[in-house]
A protein has these predicted regions:
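NTP-dependent small-molecule kinase module
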Residues: 2-8, 28, 32, 140-174
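Hydrophobic anchor at the beta1->P-loop junction of P-loop NTPases
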Residues: 14
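P-loop (Walker A) phosphate-binding loop of NTP-binding proteins
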Residues: 17
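Conserved lysine of the Walker
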Residues: 22
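ATP-dependent small-molecule kinase phosphotransfer cores
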Residues: 39-97, 122-123, 131, 135, ...
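A glycine- and Lys/Arg-enriched "phosphate-lid" helix/loop adjacent to the NTP-binding pocket
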Residues: 100-144
């Protein structure tokens, strides 16, 4: 069947703002393509044995970005769907790693991101002013997402399955 052709497209990177659904879409897309799903944030946590918030607090953001870049480099050697942390694409070394790969930017409307992240308390960057922070992050990061993306999909208020289907269809025709 089409499985070999699909996995030939891998790795596939997923980028987007917090709340875009990178992890959920990544998991479902990987299932659909019959490949592994790798979350670079989870990879860093596993390697370091502590939460990202701790790494930020103790070692600082720059140190975390180095760990993250290593995790991305490793993840991209696998036949997998790779969900990248929200800030990863802002790191030049990560953008370099992604060039030549299939990368999907999951673009969600501002209100949708605010709604999705409001219920989640584990996002240290969004604690005080989620809406303002997300707006600032979009301004900072969107140009990077668009520069690495080979596919852009919208993730609105509809079912996440629609997003997965849209990506799978574009991968087939890529």
């Amino acid at each position: 069947g089409g499985r070999a052709r699909m996995s030939a497209q891998c790795p596939v990177g997923l980028v987007g703002l917090p709340g875009a659904g990178k992890s959920k879409v990544g998991r479902l897309l990987a299932e659909r393509l019959c490949v592994d799903h790798i979350d670079t944030d989870a990879l860093v946590v596993e390697r370091e044995g502590r939460p990202i918030a701790d790494i930020f607090a103790t070692d600082g953001e720059a140190a975390f970005r180095v760990m993250e870049t290593e995790a991305v480099a490793d993840a991209l050697t696998h036949d997998a769907v790779v969900s990248l942390g929200g800030g990863a694409a802002a790191t030049p070394a990560v953008r370099e790693l992604l060039s030549g790969h299939t990368v999907v930017y999951i673009d969600a409307p501002h209100e949708e991101l605010v709604r999705r992240t409001a219920s989640k308390t584990h996002r240290p960057l969004l604690a005080d002013d989620p809406s303002g922070t997300l707006a600032r992050l979009r301004t900072e990061r969107e140009p990077h997402y668009r520069s690495v993306a080979t596919i852009v999909v919208e993730s609105g208020s509809g079912p996440v399955d629609d997003v997965v289907t849209a990506i799978a269809q574009q991968l087939e025709h890529a």
